[in-house]
């Protein structure tokens, strides 16, 4: 079965075609970074309007690249939540309208399930069970994954997500949007040892996270440097960026390793936008060696929000017998707030 997937939960418009037997056939992605840069963050109304402009051309592009027509499509999938309500409604409306016009089933997918399963698009493909570290701008969670739809929450952030800590710290340093990648690039030129920043909850003994204290510590350093009309010099900014990144990465890696030890598992899947961070990947590669454990990441091109992960998650649900393939009446809703535990498979 060929599934056409749509992602529009925030500031990326993604469309993809996935075959349940052959995997990813084609995907196309448009990012709104340039549009939101002048505002320093995502403007929900602008995001929704841009999704409307982009989704049909991207759909045509994917079908052309895959050598398909709508007659070849057996089901449609879309991100049903969580995310920005207006943005979610664009992808959901297009998917449901297309499904209605072709008498096809429409499958609503949890955004985080898309991220969680996206490393399975790469080779070698991790086998179940595994521990998943989901790290993005809006979420930081550790999950035990025993199969598609079989997820156990092990720990999560109690305040800011890791990606949010990157972005907010970058903003405090006067870096551009999106802050996380800008901070990571600047950190390459810095000396992390110059600033002693906290590692919140590093030794808490549990698998939860907290990054608000780190953000406050960064603010304190910036205020100290700019007191009495001073400014944060270029090298100071690079050093502070390096120290901030090192603190976030150390906590993420330590908690992930603790999760592996507590569960007895030896496979770690890392997904979400922060999963593209080079220091995190390198740090985990070193830290996992003594455990004889392996880390799995999605391709860099699929770390951000994308349609491929949504179509693929739908395909995995179809193969696991967890998708309702009846056509239905195409009445639908979206869920801006949605706990991943709510989609457990029995």
Swiss-Prot record:
Compartments, record wording: Cytoplasm
Positions annotated to bind Fe cation: 111, 115, 305
GO cellular component, one term: cytoplasm
Reaction(s) the record says it catalyses: L-threonylcarbamoyladenylate + adenosine(37) in tRNA = N(6)-L-threonylcarbamoyladenosine(37) in tRNA + AMP + H(+)
Cofactor(s) annotated in UniProt: Fe(2+)
SUPFAM superfamilies: Actin-like ATPase domain
EC number(s) per entry: 2.3.1.234
UniProt xrefs under InterPro entries: ATPase_NBD, Gcp-like_dom, KAE1/TsaD, TsaD
MF GO annotations: iron ion binding; N(6)-L-threonylcarbamoyladenine synthase activity
Residues binding substrate, per UniProt: 134-138, 167, 180, 277
Record note on cofactor: Binds 1 Fe(2+) ion per subunit.
Top-level taxon in the UniProt lineage: Bacteria
Coiled-coil stretches noted in the UniProt entry, renumbered to this chain: none
Keyword terms: Acyltransferase, Cytoplasm, Iron, Metal-binding, Transferase, tRNA processing
Family designation: Belongs to the KAE1 / TsaD family.
Role this protein plays: Required for the formation of a threonylcarbamoyl group on adenosine at position 37 (t(6)A37) in tRNAs that read codons beginning with adenine. Is involved in the transfer of the threonylcarbamoyl moiety of threonylcarbamoyl-AMP (TC-AMP) to the N6 group of A37, together with TsaE and TsaB. TsaD likely plays a direct catalytic role in this reaction.
Protein name: tRNA N6-adenosine threonylcarbamoyltransferase
